[in-house]
């Protein structure tokens, strides 16, 4: 059945099951393109941003995207000459993830998951190691930090990606870069210590990825807490052993902690101090030292999964700067390996090997066979949607909206500031709500509250 909304006087309050693996994606419904900083000017790109198309079957979600964010990218202060370019991605996300082999499957170079805006994430490595020996691998969060734009992203041969939580540098109590001062970007989301962080993406094993704040207790109780990783810095001053205790031959030693090393890129880079944490092998997992397991995740209740799900968390330190392993060092679940391109996997090159060889439907906002048509497309969007707890908005936010329930009653009035920060729907009756843009008088968006 299909309901046509006129004004916002629709008559049925629909109690709809959440399908976050479908509804979480930020679809490009306005044809907007990406943009980047060139000097002091924002330049409009030709390629569309966000996700272009979402298709699904009973077992998989297929996500089509260019890998271009809506938020501004560039410049890259390390001199990276590349810009974000369209990648024509097709990703395949399992809808019913299964636990993988004991110990998980290590992530490799290249993309390891995809954010809800179609931009990919990488693991902590930057593809280089000390003396090119493949023993002491560089931590991209340290060596590449000076080359990230305000949103903490950068391109590798046009493939724009994030190695760590996709928030802006200045969304921190002690920013590790000042690039946002002159070249601001809102990034994917902002941190809120009082709210559960949003669902920000999916790994290629099908498990969701959240920002760094979750419920203090896995059952959803105890308020909100920062998820603390169990990966800790080792207590070493020389790099002569690996985290598992392996004693290295002298020709495999890394630089002493704090010694000066010259990064391999950019050409002519000045030496930097190889502080503890500069290399992946400076870290070890200490059971019980944090709230997350060795995959940087846990099984817990989340707003989108009220019955609980295994989920990864993009971890930050107490200053809200990215903290190793940033996303996840290995997959807990069975990995859909067609998501990796031509390079070694998991990880691979820039593309994917995904093809659709089954019957699929196109996601248009339908839930359980019910779809809605509005009389005006929205220039802004809500996420997550469906939403159980806190709803946030992005895009071109109106100065104020009124929210109507299924009986046509105005139940709330929200400002642009409040919409950007997030609004709690806790205690609201389940149903479908409509936003009316008071500037244009148009009813532009549905919020599904199961």
Where does each model-flagged region fall?
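Positively charged n-region of N-terminal signal peptides that target proteins for export
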Residues: 1-4, 450
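N-terminal signal peptide c-region/cleavage motif recognized by signal peptidases
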Residues: 13-17
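Solvent-exposed N-terminal domain segments of exported/luminal and surface proteins
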Residues: 19-149
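A glycine-anchored, Pro-Gly-centered beta-turn/N-cap motif
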Residues: 158, 308, 429-432
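Extended, compositionally biased non-globular segments
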Residues: 207, 212, 221-344, 365
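C-terminal outer-membrane/trafficking sorting elements
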Residues: 371-383, 387-450
């Amino acid at each position: 059945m299909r309901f046509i909304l006129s004004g916002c006087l629709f008559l049925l309050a629909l109690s709809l099951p959440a399908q976050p693996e479908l509804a979480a994606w930020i679809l490009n419904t306005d044809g907007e393109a990406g943009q980047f900083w060139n000097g002091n000017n924002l330049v409009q790109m030709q390629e569309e941003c966000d996700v272009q198309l979402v298709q699904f079957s009973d077992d998989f979600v297929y996500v089509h995207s260019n890998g271009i964010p809506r938020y501004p990218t560039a410049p890259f202060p390390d001199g990276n000459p590349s810009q974000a370019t369209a990648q024509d991605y097709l990703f395949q996300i399992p809808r019913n993830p299964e636990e993988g082999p004991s110990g998980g499957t290590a992530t490799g170079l290249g993309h390891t998951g995809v954010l809800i805006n179609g931009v990919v994430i990488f693991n902590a490595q930057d593809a280089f190691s000390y003396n090119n020996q493949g023993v002491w691998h560089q931590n991209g969060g340290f060596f590449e930090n000076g080359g990230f734009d305000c949103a903490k992203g950068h391109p590798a041969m046009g493939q724009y990606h994030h190695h760590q939580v996709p928030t802006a540098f200045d969304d921190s109590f002690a920013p590790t870069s000042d690039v946002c001062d002159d070249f601001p970007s809102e990034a994917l989301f902002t941190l809120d210590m009082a709210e559960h962080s949003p669902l920000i993406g999916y790994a290629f094993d099908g498990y969701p990825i959240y920002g760094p704040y979750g419920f203090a207790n896995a059952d959803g109780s105890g308020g909100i807490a920062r998820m603390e990783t169990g990966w800790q810095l080792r207590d070493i001053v020389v790099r002569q052993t690996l985290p598992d205790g392996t004693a290295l031959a002298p020709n495999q030693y890394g630089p002493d902690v704090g010694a000066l090393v010259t990064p391999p890129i950019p050409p002519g880079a000045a030496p930097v101090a190889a502080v503890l944490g500069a290399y992946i092998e400076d870290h070890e997992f200490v059971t019980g030292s944090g709230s997350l397991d060795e995959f940087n995740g846990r099984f817990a209740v989340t707003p989108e999964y009220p019955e609980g799900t295994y989920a990864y968390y993009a971890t930050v330190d107490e200053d809200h700067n990215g903290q190793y392993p940033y996303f996840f060092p290995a997959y807990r679940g069975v990995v859909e390996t067609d998501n990796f391109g031509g390079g070694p996997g998991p990880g691979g090159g820039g593309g994917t090997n995904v093809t659709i060889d089954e019957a699929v439907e196109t996601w248009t906002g339908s839930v359980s066979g019910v779809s809605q048509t509005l009389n005006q497309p929205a220039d802004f969007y809500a996420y997550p949607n469906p939403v159980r707890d806190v709803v946030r908005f992005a895009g071109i936010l109106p100065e104020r909206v009124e929210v109507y329930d299924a009986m046509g009653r105005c139940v709330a009035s929200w400002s642009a500031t409040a919409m950007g920060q997030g609004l709690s729907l806790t205690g609201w009756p389940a149903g479908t709500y409509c936003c009316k843009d008071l500037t244009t008088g148009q009813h532009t968006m549905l919020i599904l509250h199961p």
